[in-house]
Amino acid sequence: MVSAVLLIQKATPETITQFHDQLSNELPTLRGKWNFNFKIFRNNPYSIPQELAETATVAPESKWLYTLSPSYLSDSSISLINGKSVGVFTNLIKEEAGEHGHSVELSIPNSHLHKGATTDLNDPFDFFVAQKLQSLWTQRQLIRGDGGRIYELENGNLTIRTSNVFLHGNFRGLLVQIEINQNLCNVDDVSSFASTFETIRNKYGIPAGDLSCEVLDPKRLDTYADLIYQYSKILNF
């Protein structure tokens, strides 16, 4: 899947209701509700690499760590460090996922579990960073997405997720996450993604806003890496 994230900061209750009504008129398949947590961490400036300890009193540069935990990825989180390195972490065990009806796309294989090849974490990765790595990373912001809805259109080739965005309890806009099948775009030309998503925005009456369809590596598209990269661009308050 290829994604784009749109934030409509000037959204009002009226425009949100109108948008949902318009999507409903397209007779989509409703895939339930969702929410997300997006956390932003900054490196501790006094945590200095050993090789610089004798020449520097603070870290020479600021680094940022982002974590995204959408509810549709059960017990999983995506992390991005400094816009370069991405990791996907899950506590979901494959043999248990099937029993509870969860997707096994992001899960710990049974063989890994039996051989001890896991992170051995009981807590979500973002919680682990906040609680166990305080000497390295300091949480700066927690952005929540609540009241989300999932619409599936065009025979499953298009998914539109909407969510109200809150920072410190204050409404900051309507987030629209658009996901399309790769056969609906030219994956060999990432510069064409913007026009593709703009066409979708106009077709389904999605209000205008700040849109990011940037990818982490144009030569190697990655669903989750590109998604959190787009979140880091859009939810940078």
UniProtKB/Swiss-Prot annotation:
Localization in the cell: Nucleus
Listed under GO cellular component are: mediator complex
Keyword annotations: Activator, Nucleus, Transcription, Transcription regulation
Q: What is its main location?
A: nucleus
One biological process GO term for this chain? regulation of transcription by RNA polymerase II
Highest taxon of source = Eukaryota
* Cited InterPro entries: Mediator_Med20 (IPR013921)
User: GO molecular function of the protein, one example?
Assistant: transcription coregulator activity
Which first-to-last residue range defines the signal peptide? none
Quaternary structure?
Component of the Mediator complex.
The protein's job, in short, is: Component of the Mediator complex, a coactivator involved in the regulated transcription of nearly all RNA polymerase II-dependent genes. Mediator functions as a bridge to convey information from gene-specific regulatory proteins to the basal RNA polymerase II transcription machinery. Mediator is recruited to promoters by direct interactions with regulatory proteins and serves as a scaffold for the assembly of a functional preinitiation complex with RNA polymerase II and the general transcription factors.
Q: Which family does it belong to?
A: Belongs to the Mediator complex subunit 20 family.
UniProt-recorded name of the protein: Mediator of RNA polymerase II transcription subunit 20
Origin organism is Scheffersomyces stipitis (strain ATCC 58785 / CBS 6054 / NBRC 10063 / NRRL Y-11545)
